[in-house]
Amino acid sequence: MKNSELESLINEKLNSTSFSDYGPNGLQVEGRETVQKIITGVTASQALLDEAVRQNADAVIVHHGYFWKNESPIIRGMKRNRLKTLLANDINLYGYHLPLDAHPELGNNVQLAQLLGITIMGEIEPLVPWGELAMPVPGLELASWIEARLGRRPLWSGDTGPDLVKRVAWCTGGGQGFIDSAARFGVDAFITGEVSEQTIHSAREQGLHFYAAGHHATERGGIRALSEWLTENTDLDVTFIDIPNPA
């Protein structure tokens, strides 16, 4: 498949042109024209690129790519090394950020809900769905369940939360800023990837459980689902690589 055809295929599936994002979605660094072997991962880190080189990949597809708004345009150090690896080895880099958060089938939010057994009921605002657990559980039990499903112990704050958690809102990655919207909506718990200092105060003062389960851990689902979709719908050789990241 041509690299431009792969871009068009994913763009159409994820409806990527409809998003105003923090960076470009699609083909970010052009490599060889023909693509057959693809490595996917959460972030285009040097470790992921090195694995792509080791496996003679034609392309890398990630959720966190390059060229974010307001980042320095200077190419030196870590940024130089990453781009040099791609260009010297003629590897294409594709990045899909918000389109891979929001997709109703492959998106990070939907995939996290499926992993945790949450039935999606609706959306509080864009990128912030809410839903219900199959049965109410204590806050500590939900923390243990999140750890079991994601392989990472979440930071949990439940000082003033209800005895049992049933209604849950969530936003994968760095979604802690949505906690106030979730509280106003009236959920029992809010799950995201990251935590800020003020997040805990918001949780305590508004009476809900808060779980920071890891930016990386909560956003493996989308790129993994996209990998599976490509495998099922094309003849491409696609391999998801999980580069460990505790953050």
Where are each of the predicted segments found?
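Hydrophobic structural segments
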Residues: 1-247
